[in-house]
Curated annotation (Swiss-Prot):
This is Pro-epidermal growth factor. GO terms for cellular component: plasma membrane. It is a single-pass type I membrane protein. Interacts with EGFR and promotes EGFR dimerization. Interacts with RHBDF1; may retain EGF in the endoplasmic reticulum and regulates its degradation through the endoplasmic reticulum-associated degradation (ERAD). Interacts with RHBDF2. EGF stimulates the growth of various epidermal and epithelial tissues in vivo and in vitro and of some fibroblasts in cell culture. Magnesiotropic hormone that stimulates magnesium reabsorption in the renal distal convoluted tubule via engagement of EGFR and activation of the magnesium channel TRPM6. It comes from Canis lupus familiaris. InterPro entries: 6-blade_b-propeller_TolB-like, cEGF, Cueball_EGF_LRP_Nidogen, EGF-like_Ca-bd_dom, EGF-like_dom, EGF-type_Asp/Asn_hydroxyl_site, EGF_Ca-bd_CS, Growth_fac_rcpt_cys_sf. One of its GO terms (molecular function) is growth factor activity. It is found in: Membrane. Residues 316-357, 358-398, 399-439, 437-479, 743-783, 834-872, 873-914, 915-955, 974-1015 form the EGF-like domain. LDL-receptor class B repeats lie at residues 86-127, 128-169, 170-213, 214-260, 485-525, 526-568, 569-611, 612-655, 656-698. Residues 1055-1216 are cytoplasmic. Disulfide bonds join 320-332, 327-341, 343-356, 362-373, 369-382, 384-397, 403-414, 410-423, 425-438, 441-453, 449-463, 465-478, 747-758, 754-767, 769-782, 838-849, 843-858, 860-871, 877-891, 884-900, 902-913, 919-932, 926-941, 943-954, 978-992, 986-1003, 1005-1014.
Length: 1216
């Protein structure tokens, strides 16, 4: 188990190196001979220190923070640095002094006096020693950092110079010169094992070490001094390599870091940066004008002075390091003889002497707070209750009594105290020394934080970053994580790319471009969109320049601005010739006019997809900055005053700030999205700004006065840096990075390139594999675990789920292979100041300044002619020097070139024109049953062997077929299947179809998804179906309740029937069983006889009313009639009202229809027996069913009603 850990332990702590172009998010170089790697760790930004004249300067690798550290360092300076001590040490041979200063330029002091003829110096940062060589005495001396305890390390050397050491490997290197021969030497730090690495007949003038790759570099001059070269070898003197591509003739000094070499030359006041292996990716840092070139150069970074491994420390240091293992969360005190653990202020050592514990200052009442104290790790702060504020001393609380008027001009607020009015600050801010200004989160500089300022206490705060950004070591700046960002910009005749520090400067598209001012990038499909002002069309292409396709070819006049809505998948452009703003989807379909009223000369345009707003500049009669919704409604004027030619415009999506520039006024301004808090960032020193971009902490804009790209701080407008290099009219700047356009979904396009699962994280596509698979080495495909060899740990295959580096690249993998060696290599120049050799020459806009030494000349660009100061366009079409095919195209002249405009029926790339097969593509107008035949530049329609006109319908010779409705056809109801090239166009199982009526491809989305490509989840559908689900649940519950109630009612009804039946069987007697009490022997009436003649059973339904009175009695009726029982005491003839039995409650036949059935016995009859047998309960409005068999007379029911009170009429029906 321990063996793999031991093997992998060095790998875990190695950081690989890819690039050094981001000043705030630097990748740590990998310690390997190849010098190649991938971004893996983050370190502080490196910077340069160099001598220039008699001063020492520092500058960032991007040209920022150029400042003087030492004003009078001496004429010939030999220097080195100690990173942990943050010091620069230098030797002034003329004054014979060793001096030092902090890296920030403070506390300059003399260390000691030294002897004459010092020819080289280096610092041993591990043993805390200074080593220098004396060329005349032939010795190398070692002293401590104060210049004391000197001892000679090496003697009897031949003119030693250019000392360099590697304390990790414990080697010292130096150069010597004897007669006409030069040589390189090596020894260990004990002064033994001296070895000659190389001997040459030429002079060696400078030596530098690459401590990361363990390489030795040196500058070698020819004897006559006419040329020089840079060589390298390993620490043993083997593998000597000549850097052929570094073609400068007068190398002076150099330094190395990672994959780059930094060097200066004798004749130019510049510092060059190039790839140390190939000599390419050259960048020139142009310094202030001076009559001397930069002298010694050193790159400052902690990786250039790494910590030592075990075995390289001094004995005392070893002991402290061994003791340090017992100190947890503390430090080892090296000044103590016991080498015990020590703790920082605010902590105390634990009883076992190994831990540092926090001291609770609030518990000891020695904090000095008047009302409240809050302990925090390592410190504390005072608090105040509600209604009180903490005074600036941070201890006392005072009741909040506002000053009558803010006469003290406090930046925040004022409180009235016994000592008078005092300014105070909100939580997270402190009062400055002036007693009025607050610094912290409430200050204009946001507490020095580039993004978030987070209050920690009333007097402290810390900086934070938005998701996707990393806080840098300065604890203030935020840098974007992920791949290295770069710039895209239209350069009039071509499209170029460049990293922020000027490296990787090249051309992306250059063939048949015409004039291009409008450009933008789609991060989802990784394509660029650009508009031609001369050719009057809009194109798009891949990032490697391939697959160019025209989107808008008609109705375009002067498109000068273009913006991509990467979320809603549309793009918008300004047309100053037609004075309108238009938009369409990313395929050029569904074109619509957005703004056409009250607009004069629109130029720059930007879109905010999250805010659903468009922003644009208008350079016309009423110059202004405006915005509207994406549909062109809700227009809002952002700015209309102090504007002349507002040109470029851009949006900071992190802070929701709007930036624009005015070409005529030469100003850069910013404001909120609604136009509030408008302020100027820069003025007068920005040339003629044309286009803008913003990312991280900087604003980029192009300058047409001195064709270049300038960068300033986006909050202050300071730290101006100019990038230039053979530029014409740079415009439409675009920053390419996943976080530059937040919210992009790269997984929407071709599943992000992933074979299985694609997940988006901060704008990048992360590929995952399903269970049972692992990622292939390309990071996109998946390999099955069964039957495939899984790459071993440490191989090139990344089996994790992290995003692979380089997902966003300025070019495709094979782009460099297509570049011929003869292609001109672009060289970017970082200009610290605007003073350069080309400034007084005054080259034409269409010319390039070529500076060689003290001379500078102007050369007209390709496609132009002149003396360089005046250049004129060459009309290639008129001169007949084009290659446009005359039969299929027309030559159109552009500035610096030409374009072959294809004739109707042809399509091309601007040079070549190919015939369009209208028949195959379905672009013909042949009628039904006609045969389309393609021709060169045209097509014909044939009807049964005879020629027909386009649109003519041919007679059908075959009977029409009637397909079944459920059959599948490629064309139905104006819809047609999409071609195979559109596979994957519709996402989430959507079905692609082509709608002929509108000439557009559309997606039929499955339920739950919406959007042009079904890329969005339908939240309304989800909410609607969630509501329907809840309704269905409620309905199910309601149905269940109803069923239960019905079952309960049925149970109650059955119980009631059973009880009624039981009571009837006990209490009711058959009227036919007992004789009449009155002894009546009268003959039954006709109706009674008629009723008695029926053998089937009968039952009576009696409907009672509330006002049924005593004495009411039912009447004997004929079959099928009803009687109204009126208010009477004895039956009277003619008092019965007969009605139809169908309209009232009835006397029903057939016992199965009743609620209950009487006994079926057939016994004696008579009214007397009925009177004694029936008992009618007094239920209100309730029908009562009574079963009888062959009743003789209904008059026998009279006794049943004699005891009741009089009621309203009662109706009965008798039905057979």
């Amino acid at each position: 188990m321990l063996l793999p850990l031991i093997i992998l332990w060095p790998v875990v702590f190695k950081c690989s190196f890819a690039s050094l172009s981001d000043p705030e998010n630097w990748n740590c170089p990998e310690v390997s001979p190849s010098g190649k790697g991938s971004p893996a760790c983050v370190g502080p930004a490196p910077f340069l220190i160099f001598s220039h004249g008699i001063s020492i300067f520092r500058i960032d690798l991007e040209g920022t923070n150029h400042e003087q550290l030492v004003a009078d360092a001496g004429v010939s300076v030999i220097m080195d640095f100690h990173y942990n001590k943050e010091r620069i040490y230098w030797v002034d041979p003329e004054r014979q002094l060793l001096q030092r200063v902090f890296l920030n330029g403070t506390r300059q002091e003399r260390v000691c006096n030294i002897e004459k003829n010092v020819s080289g110096m280096a610092i041993n940062w591990i043993n805390e020693e200074l080593i220098w060589s004396n060329q005349q005495e032939g010795i190398i001396t070692v002293t401590d950092m104060k210049g004391n305890n000197s001892r000679v390390l090496l003697r009897a050397l031949n003119y030693p110079a250019n000392v360099a050491i590697d304390p990790i490997e414990r080697f010292i290197f130096w150069s010597s010169e004897v007669a006409v021969a030069g040589s390189l030497h090596r020894a260990d730090l004990n002064g033994v094992e001296e070895k000659i690495l190389l001997q040459t007949s030429e002079r060696i003038t400078a030596v530098s070490l690459d401590v990361l790759d363990k390489q030795l570099f040196w500058i070698q001059y020819s004897r006559d001094g006419s040329n020089s070269h840079i060589y390298s070898c390993n620490y043993d003197g083997g593998s000597v390599h000549l850097s052929k591509h570094l073609t400068q003739h007068n190398f002076f000094a150099m330094s190395l870091f990672g994959n780059q070499i930094f060097y200066s030359t004798w004749k130019k006041k510049t510092i060059w940066i190039a790839n140390k292996h190939s000599g390419k990716d050259m960048v020139r840092i142009n310094l202030d004008s001076s009559f001397v070139p930069p002298g010694g150069i050193k790159v400052v970074h902690p990786l250039l002075q790494p910590k030592a491994e075990s075995g390289t420390w001094a004995p005392d240091q070893k002991l402290c390091k061994w003791k340090q293992g017992n100190c947890r969360g503390s430090t080892c005190g090296q000044d103590s003889k016991s080498y015990s653990c020590t703790c920082a202020e605010g902590y105390t050592l634990s009883q076992d002497g190994k831990y540092c514990e926090d001291v609770n200052e609030c518990a000891f009442w020695n904090h000095g707070c008047t009302l409240g104290c809050e302990n925090i790790p390592g410190s504390y702060y005072c608090t105040c209750p509600v209604g009180f504020i903490l005074l600036p001393d941070g201890k006392r609380c005072h009741q909040l009594i506002a000053c009558p008027s803010n006469t003290s001009k406090c930046s925040h607020d004022c409180v009235l105290t016994s000592d008078g009015p005092i300014c105070f600050c909100p939580e997270g801010s402190v009062l400055e020394a002036d007693g009025k200004t607050c610094s912290g989160c409430s200050s204009p500089d946001n507490g020095g934080c580039s993004q978030l300022c987070l209050p920690l206490s009333p007097v402290s705060w810390e900086c934070g970053c938005f998701p996707g950004y990393d806080l840098q070591l300065d604890k203030q700046s935020c840098a974007a994580s992920g791949p290295q960002p770069f710039l895209l910009f239209a350069n009039s005749q071509d499209i170029r790319h460049m990293h922020f520090d000027g490296t990787d400067y090249g051309t992306l598209l250059s063939q048949q471009m015409g004039m291009v001012f409008a450009l933008d990038h789609d991060p989802v499909e990784n394509k660029i969109y650009f508009a031609h002002t001369a050719l009057k069309w809009i194109e798009r292409a891949n990032m490697d320049g391939s697959q160019r396709e025209r989107l808008i070819e008609e109705g375009v006049d002067v498109p000068e601005g273009l913006a991509i809505d990467w979320i809603d998948r549309k793009f918008y452009w300004t047309d100053s010739g037609k004075s309108l703003i238009e938009g369409s989807d990313l395929n050029g379909k569904h074109r619509e006019i957005i703004i056409k009223e009250d607009i004069s000369q629109p130029r720059g345009i930007a879109v905010h997809p999250m805010a659903k707003r468009l922003f644009w500049t208008d350079m016309g009669i009423n110059p202004r900055i405006e915005s509207s919704s994406l549909q062109g409604i809700g227009r809002l004027v952002i700015a209309s005053s102090d504007l002349v030619w507002p040109s470029g415009i851009t949006i900071d999506y992190v802070t929701d700030k709007l930036y624009w520039c005015d070409t005529k006024l030469s100003v850069i301004e910013m404001a909120n999205l609604d136009g509030s808090k408008r302020q100027r960032l820069a003025q007068n020193d920005v040339g003629h700004p044309f286009a803008m971009a913003v990312f991280e902490d900087h604003v980029w804009f192009s300058d047409w006065t001195m064709p270049s790209i300038i960068r300033v701080d986006k909050r202050t407008g300071k730290n101006r840096v100019r990038l230039r290099g053979s530029m014409l009219k740079p415009s439409s700047l675009v920053v390419v990075h996943p976080l530059a356009k937040p919210g992009a979904q790269p997984c929407l396009y071709q599943n992000g390139g992933c074979e299985h699962i694609c997940k988006e994280r901060f704008g990048t596509a992360q590929c995952l594999c399903r269970e049972g698979f692992v990622k292939a080495p390309d990071g996109k495909m998946c390999l099955a675990l069964n039957g495939h060899q899984i790459p071993a740990v440490g191989s090139e295959a990344d089996l994790s789920n992290h995003v692979t580096p380089g997902d966003v690249l300025p070019r495709s993998e094979g782009f460099e292979d297509n570049i011929t060696e003869s292609q001109h290599m672009l060289v970017a120049e970082i200009m610290v100041s605007d003073a350069d050799d080309c400034a007084p020459v005054g080259c034409s806009t269409w010319a390039e300044c070529v500076s060689e030494g003290e001379n500078a000349t102007c050369q007209c660009l390709k496609g132009f002619t002149g003396d360089g100061k005046l250049c004129f366009d060459i009309d290639e079409c008129e001169m007949g020097i084009t290659i446009c095919p005359p039969t299929s195209s027309k030559c159109v002249n552009t500035e610096g070139g030409y374009v072959c405009q294809c004739s109707e029926g042809y399509r091309g790339d601007g040079i070549h024109c190919l015939d369009i097969n209208e028949c195959q593509l379905g672009m013909h107008t042949c009628g039904e049953n006609a045969t389309c035949t393609n021709m060169e530049g045209n097509y014909t329609c044939m009807c049964a062997g005879s020629l027909s006109e386009p649109g003519q319908i041919c007679a059908d010779s075959t009977p029409p077929s009637h397909p079944m409705e459920d059959s599948h056809y490629s064309v139905r109801n104006g819809y047609r299947e999409c071609p195979s090239s559109y596979d994957g166009y519709c996402l989430y199982n959507g079905v692609c179809m082509y709608i002929e009526a509108v000439d557009r491809y559309a997606c039929n989305c499955v339920f739950g998804y919406v959007g042009e490509r079904c890329q969005h989840r339908d939240l309304k559908w989800e909410l609607r179906h969630a509501g329907q689900g809840r309704q269905r649940q409620v309905a199910a519950v309601a149905v269940g309740v109803v069923v239960l109630v019905l079952l309960l009612l049925l149970g109650l009804g059955g119980a009631h029937c059973y009880r009624t039946k039981k009571l009837s069987s006990k209490n009711l007697k058959n009227p036919y069983e007992e004789p009449s009490r009155e002894g009546s022997s009268s003959r039954p009436s006709d109706s009674e006889a008629r009723m008695a003649s029926f053998p089937q059973p009968w039952f009576v339904v009696i409907k009672e009313h509330q006002n049924l009175r005593n004495g009411s009695q039912p009447m004997a009726l004929k079959d099928g009639e009803s009687a109204d029982v009126s208010q009477f005491s004895s039956p009277e003839p003619g008092s019965v009202k007969r009605t139809s039995w169908r309209n009232e409650h009835q006397l029903y036949k057939d016992t199965e229809q009743g609620c209950c059935t009487p006994p079926s016995s057939n016994r004696g009859t008579g009214s007397q027996s009925m009177e004694q047998s029936f008992s009618v309960p007094s239920y209100e409005a309730q029908p009562i069913a009574l079963g009888v068999e062959k009743p003789q007379s209904l008059l026998s029911a009279k006794p049943l009603l004699q005891q009741r009170a009089p009621d309203p009429p009662h109706q009965m029906k008798l039905i057979q």
